[in-house]
């Protein structure tokens, strides 16, 4: 829920991630490693992680892979991603609110780095699930950031 008490939907957090609609200065994982986002990836409307082909650095390492988004840390396990190999390529778990007692691990028992967005948001204006989803679809159709070329040539 937002501070106003209005419900927040996962699609809204996905929209925020897709548009990078947050203060990206000083981004860090919940365990303190610096994050730099080069590309948030492409929104996946099918099975599997929420965003594919994301590019980012965590600490001194560069990553290319998937990003999964949830309202809270517990969403990872609640949705069964810890038991689904389709989520083994996730490089970052983005949540609105971090829950310290909910570790995020894939089927290979590797811990997935987590980013809590709440401290980086200026204001969270709740939108309906339908509004957020429609906006994500429009973002997906934009050719910005060399989108057309990347989509046609991305491995």
Question: Where on the chain are the PLM-derived regions?
Answer:
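Internal, well-ordered alpha/beta segment that forms a basic, Gly-enriched binding/recognition surface
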Residues: 95-155
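Short glycine-/polar-rich loops that comprise or flank the Walker A/P-loop
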Residues: 87-90, 110-112
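Active-site ExK catalytic segment of metal-dependent nucleases
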Residues: 64-72, 93-95
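Divalent-cation
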Residues: 83
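Short Lys/Arg-enriched alpha/beta "domain-start" segment
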Residues: 2-36
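Active-site beta-strand-loop-beta-strand hairpin of nuclease catalytic cores
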Residues: 55-66
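C-terminal structured domains
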Residues: 30, 41-43
């Amino acid at each position: 829920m937002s501070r106003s008490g209005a419900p927040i939907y996962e699609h809204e957090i996905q929209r925020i991630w897709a548009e990078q609609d947050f203060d990206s200065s000083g981004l860090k994982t919940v365990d303190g490693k610096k994050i730099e986002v080069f590309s948030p990836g492409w929104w996946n409307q099918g099975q599997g992680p929420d965003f594919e082909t994301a590019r980012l650095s965590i600490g001194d390492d560069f990553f290319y892979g998937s990003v999964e988004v949830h309202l809270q840390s517990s969403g990872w396990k609640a949705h069964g991603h810890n038991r689904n190999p389709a989520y083994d390529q996730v490089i970052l778990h983005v949540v609105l609110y971090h829950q310290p007692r909910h570790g995020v691990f894939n089927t290979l028992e590797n811990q997935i780095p987590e980013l809590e967005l709440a401290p980086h948001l200026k204001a969270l204006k709740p939108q309906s699930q339908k509004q957020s989803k429609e906006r994500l679809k429009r973002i997906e159709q934009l050719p910005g950031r060399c989108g057309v070329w990347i989509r046609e040539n991305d491995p």
